[in-house]
Design a protein with these regions (language model features):
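Acyl-CoA/ACP chain-elongation machinery
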Residues: 29-44, 72-82, 99-156
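Active-site-proximal gating segment of KS-fold condensing enzymes and close homologs
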Residues: 80-96
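Condensing-enzyme catalytic core mediating Claisen C-C bond formation in acyl metabolism
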Residues: 1-60, 68-69, 142, 208
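A general structural signal for well-ordered alpha-helical packing
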Residues: 24, 46, 50-53, 84-89, ...
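Conserved beta-strand-centric core segments of catalytic alpha/beta enzyme folds
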Residues: 1-15, 119-208
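Stable alpha-helical structural segments in soluble proteins, enriched in small hydrophobic residues
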Residues: 52-60, 87, 91, 127, ...
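Conserved beta-strand positions
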Residues: 69-72, 189
């Protein structure tokens, strides 16, 4: 558990450009679902997670293979983490489009603790910065990856250290220069709640 808050400014693209303010990312898709499977546990087949992501992809007119990075809800529960990773991998397996590299996935709750009601906004800020800089945040303190969440060639976990998306190289320093042409085109943020309430937002890099 942790304490925190996140505030993101949502503005029309034309207004932001006119004001000359830095644009971190563009919201291009949003999806919701409610599987109501259990008070605290998601559906074992990942139905709710897949539906939420599918709805967001449909809204953005994208395929899962277009996504470069997923900031997972992942609360470090054996059941929830495995189901969410499986849902991402299943969507990729069902996709008719080929992806040359795996989707990178990580959870930033290891950095902040679970912020409950503030988790979604803070983690969306992490995701927006990943789009802007091309630096994909690691799952802090991840030592041993559970075989249940490993899907060879489909999803790539980011343990220990952040990585540069374009090069795939590990980044040890937290002081990373901004690269607007980071190579990250689209990133997805999942936020799941008790009772099977699921939300997904897709961000686009407006600079590439």
């Amino acid at each position: 558990m942790g304490e925190g808050a996140g505030i993101l400014v949502l503005e029309e693209m034309e207004a932001a450009v006119k004001r000359g303010v830095p644009i971190l990312a563009e919201v291009c898709g949003y999806g919701l679902s409610g599987d109501a499977y259990h008070t605290t546990s998601p559906h074992p087949d990942g139905i709710g997670a897949m539906q939420s992501m599918s709805n967001a992809l449909r809204d953005a007119r994208l395929d899962i293979s277009d996504i470069d990075y997923v900031n997972c809800h992942a609360t470090s529960t054996p059941i929830g983490d495995a189901i969410e990773a499986k849902a991402v991998a299943t969507l990729l397996e069902k996709s008719t489009k080929k992806k040359n590299r795996p989707i990178y996935i990580s959870s930033t709750k290891g950095h902040t603790g679970h912020l409950l009601g503030a988790a979604g906004s803070v983690e969306l800020a992490f995701t927006a910065l990943a789009v802007q800089t091309g630096v994909l945040p690691a799952t802090l303190n991840l030592q041993d990856i559970d075989p249940a969440v490993q899907f060879e060639g489909l999803v790539q976990h980011i343990p220990h250290n952040a990585i540069n998306y374009s090069s795939g190289h590990v980044i040890d320093s937290t002081a990373v220069p901004v690269d607007k042409s980071s190579g990250v085109r689209f990133a997805m943020k999942n936020s799941f709640g008790f009772g099977g309430t699921n939300a997904t937002i897709i961000l686009r890099n407006p600079h590439i």
